[in-house]
Every structure is written in structure tokens, then in C-alpha cells.
């Protein structure tokens, strides 16, 4: 069984189609690995033992269905996405006990494609965090070193893939929450273009920033999942009517990187970047050049304002989105409130964690009448200038490359008392959310000092995931093979 969990999604699906492996065997292999690794990793908030096995047995009885691109493949879903009949908490006590009666669109599409859900992944509360230490339930650890963080907010999704508990996981990315844990956990993480994947059924953090994407072991695996979950959805007003491409087929169109121009922004390769991350990412860029790519310097001069801009906008949107959670219908409710206003106030105060409360307070402040122009309006203006920066940069290159994070995974608890340093972990990822363009993290090496995974980030123009995935796929095939699963 243990050999099965080392397979990629693409490999296990091929084995399922030829009946070399049954869906039940694939699910059992993942559930056994969950039982073995979960006491230390703590990647999952809910495990679907009986439901997954029952579904697998029913699918085996009917036989493989080649029309379903994920038939029989065990997957994990971030707990920010609604799952019919499976608890969904967004990592918060205020949603404790909440079980949706419907599936989010992304989850529904996975099910239609034949995927089997084996668990719900832990996350920072309401996706507010970079380490998964802000979960109200448990702290997820990095499968490569349990003393270190897995990244966040989709840390559970990254850890569950790296620990061999599933073949793919869905994460959400508001400011780097897919790409950061992908970098820290040594897996592939893709943040699609804003609007590429429906947000219907996702518990929102920052509605103009959030996007759902895959976390997998290989680029081809990520392309397969993106093929399934992407596309227009009438139930999401922000869903784009952009035609979907076959990203898996597109991977075979490019055998090398000749004709590809990669932009290297000086703002992402200098101050604050650790030596081991810089060396690993520069070595990967050198390999890309060997494969025919041309590199050119590009300027993203508004980067210095990106952190402040992002947190003003994200916190403002969070303060609005989280106003709906009051403890009345589900989750934590304060005891013996004297009046309705006290029920709301005390329930929210008791159930929201410190980081969530901090962001609600700041968000309310920047939206207040006296400070709206000074903060929120100015941030919106900077956001527009940042988009112009990227558009201009892409006039001279096809994709942009940078480290996904300034460092490798750091020890648990190291930054919890310093919110500003924690926020700086997102410095290379947040700009893409502000401009709505796609990005991904590709594992390229293990750091020489920490021996932890290093991710290289690729960024592309809006709706050009194809070029980004092609470049990552070619580079992945030509870099020294890295271990995909920590057993």
C-alpha cells in the first residue's frame, strides 16, 4: 500500500483506468497514511473514512469510467470550501458544528470528475495567516520537519499532499495562501487568474482577492485538476466567461523553453531574500536558460507599497465579509446574554481568534468615514498602479519569475508574536492577488542550510495559465528529481 501513496495523481489515475489498482485500494492507502502521519502532521480537521470507502466500493462495482478525468482519485478539500454533509469550519470556532447542505462549485466539479474526498484540510482561521498557526483547532506541522510550519493559510492542504495523505488538495489563495505552503511543503501550487475558478461556496476572506486552486505533486497533476475546476459559473458574479483550455494537452506542446522570455524583477531578488532560497532559485533560472529561455530584467516599482496596499484592502473586505457571523444559527454562542446586541458582541469576541479580531478592527477603521480617503481610497489607487506595472512588465516578457517566499519554512512559534514580520512572508505573492493574475510555486530544490523545500514562483498575464504551466512542466522535467512525499 505504501508504494501507492508515492504515485502522482496522473500515475494513480492511469493505474485505476487499467484496473491495476482499484479505487478502494487507493482510498485505503491514503487512509492508512492518514492514520500513520496525522498524529504528528495534524493536516486534517475532518477525515471521511466511512464515506470515502463506501464511495470507492460503489465506484469499483460499476467499473472505471474513462470519461471522468479524476475517477477514483482520493483528494482533500480546504475547510474554507463548502462540502455537502461534511463539516466546514474555515478553521474557526464561530463555525464549529456547521455542516453545509450543498457543495461549492469547485468541489462539485471534482465529484463530477470522479474524485473521492478523504478529508477536510486545516487552515488559518478564515484564511488569515501564513503558517496555519491561527487555526482555532490545531497547529499543522511541516511533513519534512515537524518543528517547522507548513505555510498558510492553506497549510493543511500543502501538508496533506506532502505527507502522502492524498493525490491532490484544493486550497485558496488571497495573498499567497496556496503558493506559500506549496513552497514550504515542496509541492506544486497554482493560483489561477481571478475569475478562472468559481468562488461559489467558498467562505470569503477578501472577495476581490480570493481564488481557489490545486496543490499537487507535479505540474501535470495540477493541470489535470485545473482542467476540472475551471470555467464559468453563473452562480458566481465574479466568474469570468473566458473559454477554458486543455492545460494537460498544452503541456505536450512545449519540449524546451526556446522562444520563451522570463522577466526577473529586481525588487524580488534583493533585500530580505535568504541566501539558500536565492541560490536555489537562481540555479533553476540558469537551468531554464540552458533549456532555451531568455531572461530580461523588469521593474515592478510599486512593489514597496504592495504589503500596505494588500492588507488595507484585504482587512477592509474581511471586516465586511465576517460581519455575517454572529453565533445565532450555528457555531459558538455566548452563555446567558442579557440582550441581542450582547449576544452578537460576546459571541464574536469569544469565538474569533486574535488575528481575525485584529483584521476586523483594522478593516473597520480604514473604511470609517474619517479615514476612508486616507487609507482605503489610496490603497485602491496604488492597486491600479500596480496593475499597470505588471502590464508594462509583460510587454517585454512572457512570464515573470521570482522566489515564492523569502525563506524556507521557519520554526513553529518563531513569528507569532511579530505580526509585521509574519505579514512580510507574503511579500513576493500578494501583488498577483491585487492585480488578479495567475501564479504558481514549483519546488526546485531543498535549501542547503535548512534542508527544507524551496519554491520558484512563475507569474503570467491574466488567463495565460497555459504558458506558465508549460514553462514549469519543462523545468520540472529537467531539474534533479526531488522527493515528492515524506514517508
Curated annotation (Swiss-Prot):
<keyword id="KW-0547">Nucleotide-binding</keyword>
<dbReference type="InterPro" id="IPR036928">
    <property type="entry name" value="AS_sf"/>
</dbReference>
<dbReference type="GO" id="GO:0006412">
    <property type="term" value="P:translation"/>
</dbReference>
<keyword id="KW-0436">Ligase</keyword>
<feature type="compositionally biased region" description="Polar residues">
    <location>
        <begin position="135"/>
        <end position="144"/>
    </location>
</feature>
<protein>
    <recommendedName>
        <fullName>Glutamyl-tRNA(Gln) amidotransferase subunit A</fullName>
        <ecNumber>6.3.5.7</ecNumber>
    </recommendedName>
</protein>
<keyword id="KW-0067">ATP-binding</keyword>
<dbReference type="InterPro" id="IPR000120">
    <property type="entry name" value="Amidase"/>
</dbReference>
<dbReference type="InterPro" id="IPR004412">
    <property type="entry name" value="GatA"/>
</dbReference>
<dbReference type="Pfam" id="PF01425">
    <property type="entry name" value="Amidase"/>
</dbReference>
<comment type="similarity">
    <text>Belongs to the amidase family. GatA subfamily.</text>
</comment>
<comment type="subunit">
    <text>Heterotrimer of A, B and C subunits.</text>
</comment>
<feature type="active site" description="Charge relay system">
    <location>
        <position position="78"/>
    </location>
</feature>
<feature type="active site" description="Charge relay system">
    <location>
        <position position="153"/>
    </location>
</feature>
<dbReference type="GO" id="GO:0005524">
    <property type="term" value="F:ATP binding"/>
</dbReference>
<dbReference type="InterPro" id="IPR020556">
    <property type="entry name" value="Amidase_CS"/>
</dbReference>
<dbReference type="GO" id="GO:0030956">
    <property type="term" value="C:glutamyl-tRNA(Gln) amidotransferase complex"/>
</dbReference>
<comment type="function">
    <text>Allows the formation of correctly charged Gln-tRNA(Gln) through the transamidation of misacylated Glu-tRNA(Gln) in organisms which lack glutaminyl-tRNA synthetase. The reaction takes place in the presence of glutamine and ATP through an activated gamma-phospho-Glu-tRNA(Gln).</text>
</comment>
<dbReference type="InterPro" id="IPR023631">
    <property type="entry name" value="Amidase_dom"/>
</dbReference>
<feature type="region of interest" description="Disordered">
    <location>
        <begin position="135"/>
        <end position="155"/>
    </location>
</feature>
<dbReference type="GO" id="GO:0050567">
    <property type="term" value="F:glutaminyl-tRNA synthase (glutamine-hydrolyzing) activity"/>
</dbReference>
<feature type="active site" description="Acyl-ester intermediate">
    <location>
        <position position="177"/>
    </location>
</feature>
<keyword id="KW-0648">Protein biosynthesis</keyword>
Amino acid at each position: 500500500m505504501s508504494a501507492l501513496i508515492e504515485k502522482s495523481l496522473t500515475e494513480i489515475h492511469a493505474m485505476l483506468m487499467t484496473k491495476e489498482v482499484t479505487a478502494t485500494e487507493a482510498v485505503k492507502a491514503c487512509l492508512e497514511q492518514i492514520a500513520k502521519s496525522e498524529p504528528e502532521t495534524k493536516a486534517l480537521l475532518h477525515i471521511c473514512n466511512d464515506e470515502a470507502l463506501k464511495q470507492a466500493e460503489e465506484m469499483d462495482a460499476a467499473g472505471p469510467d474513462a470519461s471522468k478525468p479524476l475517477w477514483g482519485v482520493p483528494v482533500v478539500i480546504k475547510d474554507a470550501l463548502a462540502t455537502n454533509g461534511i463539516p466546514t469550519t474555515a478553521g474557526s470556532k464561530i463555525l464549529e458544528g456547521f455542516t453545509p447542505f450543498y457543495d461549492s462549485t469547485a468541489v462539485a466539479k471534482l465529484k463530477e470528475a470522479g474524485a473521492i474526498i478523504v478529508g477536510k484540510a486545516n487552515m488559518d482561521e478564515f484564511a488569515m495567516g501564513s503558517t496555519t498557526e491561527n487555526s482555532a483547532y490545531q497547529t499543522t506541522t511541516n511533513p519534512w520537519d515537524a518543528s517547522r510550519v507548513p505555510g498558510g493559510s492553506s497549510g493543511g492542504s500543502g501538508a496533506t499532499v506532502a505527507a502522502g495523505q492524498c493525490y491532490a488538495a484544493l486550497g485558496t489563495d488571497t495573498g499567497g495562501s496556496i503558493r506559500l505552503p506549496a513552497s514550504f511543503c515542496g509541492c506544486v501550487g497554482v493560483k489561477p487568474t481571478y475569475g478562472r475558478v468559481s468562488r461559489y461556496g467558498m467562505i470569503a476572506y477578501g472577495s476581490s482577492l480570493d481564488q481557489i486552486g490545486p496543490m499537487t505533486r507535479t505540474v501535470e497533476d495540477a493541470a489535470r485538476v485545473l482542467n476540472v475546476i475551471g470555467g464559468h459559473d453563473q452562480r458566481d458574479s465574479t466568474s469570468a466567461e473566458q473559454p477554458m483550455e486543455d492545460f494537460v494537452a498544452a503541456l505536450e506542446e512545449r519540449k524546451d523553453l526556446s522562444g520563451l522570455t522570463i522577466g526577473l524583477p529586481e525588487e524580488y531578488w534583493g533585500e530580505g531574500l535568504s541566501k539558500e532560497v536565492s541560490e536555489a532559485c537562481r540555479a533553476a533560472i540558469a537551468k531554464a536558460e540552458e533549456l532555451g529561455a531568455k531572461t530580461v530584467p523588469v521593474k515592478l516599482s510599486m512593489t514597496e507599497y504592495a504589503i500596505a496596499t494588500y492588507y488595507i484592502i484585504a482587512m477592509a473586505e474581511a471586516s465586511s465579509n465576517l460581519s455575517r457571523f454572529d453565533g445565532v444559527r450555528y457555531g459558538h454562542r455566548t452563555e446567558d446574554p442579557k440582550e441581542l446586541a450582547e449576544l452578537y458582541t460576546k459571541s464574536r469576541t469569544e469565538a474569533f481568534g486574535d488575528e481575525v479580531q485584529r483584521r476586523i478592527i483594522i478593516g473597520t477603521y480604514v473604511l470609517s468615514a474619517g479615514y476612508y480617503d486616507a487609507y482605503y481610497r489610496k490603497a485602491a489607487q496604488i492597486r491600479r498602479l500596480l496593475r499597470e506595472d505588471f502590464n508594462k512588465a509583460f510587454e517585454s516578457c512572457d512570464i515573470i519569475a521570482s522566489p515564492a517566499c523569502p525563506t524556507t519554512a521557519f520554526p513553529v512559534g518563531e513569528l507569532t508574536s511579530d505580526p509585521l514580520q509574519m505579514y512580510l512572508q507574503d511579500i513576493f505573492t500578494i501583488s498577483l492577488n491585487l492585480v488578479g493574475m495567475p501564479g504558481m510555486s514549483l519546488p526546485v530544490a531543498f535549501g542547503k542550510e535548512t534542508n527544507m523545500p524551496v519554491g520558484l514562483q512563475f507569474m503570467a498575464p491574466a488567463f495565460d495559465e497555459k504558458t506558465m504551466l508549460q514553462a514549469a512542466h519543462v523545468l520540472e522535467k529537467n531539474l534533479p528529481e526531488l522527493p515528492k512525499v515524506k514517508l
